[in-house]
Amino acid sequence: MIRALLVAAVWLVTAPVALLPQGPDPVASRAKGRADAPITIYEMSDFQCPYCRAFTLETMPALEREYVATGKVRVVYINLPLASVHKNATIAAQAALCAAEQQRFWPMHDLLFRHQDEWAKLPAPGDYFARLGDSAGVNGARFTHCLSSGATAAAVQADAERARRAGAVSTPTFYIEGGLLEGAAPAAVFRAVLDSIYRSKTGARPR
């Protein structure tokens, strides 16, 4: 079991939970990093959540450079739209999975967070998402049909159920090798957690 770390975030040891997406949505479409990386982070997130945006823009670049690009960590994105407070979060998650069907999840992910302020309060953001999809490099007709038909709605719901089974009640929450890290913690907090896990699993110095 992972030793709980007293850091500037909530770190809870919990039981292992199956979080891999099942069925036609392959995990590879929304994972980054080597499949055999010793550590997997499941990022349970909401595209309309400002704290999730802060993590994506401020913390994730450092983690990508130091852990993902070096083969130590794999990151898997799990949708947890908080629809009661973020009215466009669910359709944004559906749009991201429509892009994932064309292997363009991460470009769409980045655009959704970068332009969050522009679409968050739109009464019907579908057309805006289609423009983001164009920028992400998707086939526009396929993307629009996917989004308008609700083709990915069940996958988003399944994601949310997985996240709740893992113990996530807010966003962002990160399930890391049996523990939960809650909130948009700074890179230093993630380093403390990841370095400890890496040493315990491999016996090697992380950096």
Features from the language model and the residues they span:
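A short beta-strand-turn-helix
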Residues: G23-I39, Y67
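Structural alpha/beta surface segment adjacent to cysteine/selenocysteine redox centers
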Residues: A37, S45-D134, A166-V169, S196-S200, ...
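C-terminal cap of thioredoxin/glutaredoxin-like
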Residues: M44-D46, L57-M60, A130-R207
